[in-house]
A protein has these predicted regions:
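Catalytic/RNA-binding core of pseudouridine synthases
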Residues: 1-125
Length: 126
């Protein structure tokens, strides 16, 4: 029996998107399994897993509107620009108020072009 469809998976921290796809392949026995967008290993959240015929939809799903929620630690810069890195500098963030944070976050609303950090789940050449 060939099952086609889309699974809505809550990817756990420390798992790669590829590991989730591999697990779904192993558990279902379905060969054509893919995901509609990569999440970094330390990120958790919705990972859409496409099965069989539904893999054709992944390019459209990746273009769909997405919403992100983040937890941040103000005042620390790491060598990888994320929580997995070694702290390079620290500053006291107590002088930063909610309005300043909201104003800074406003720059990330809408369509933006972001340069990915050196260490990321960016796909190169395919």
């Amino acid at each position: 029996m060939d099952i086609s469809g889309i699974l809505n998976v809550d990817k756990p921290v420390a798992w790669t998107s590829f590991q989730v796809v591999s697990l779904v392949r192993r558990l279902t026995g379905i060969r054509r399994v893919g995901h509609a967008g990569t999440l970094d290993p330390f990120a958790t959240g919705v990972l859409l897993i496409c099965l069989s015929q539904a893999t054709r939809l992944s390019e459209y799903l990746m273009k769909a509107t997405k919403v992100y929620r983040a937890e941040v630690c103000l005042g620390i810069v790491t060598d990888t620009f994320d929580v997995t890195g070694t702290p390079m500098s620290e500053a006291d963030p107590s002088g930063v108020d909610r309005q300043q944070v909201e104003e800074a976050l406003a720059a990330f609303v809408g369509e933006i072009e972001q340069v990915p950090p050196m260490f990321s789940a960016l796909k190169h050449g395919g």
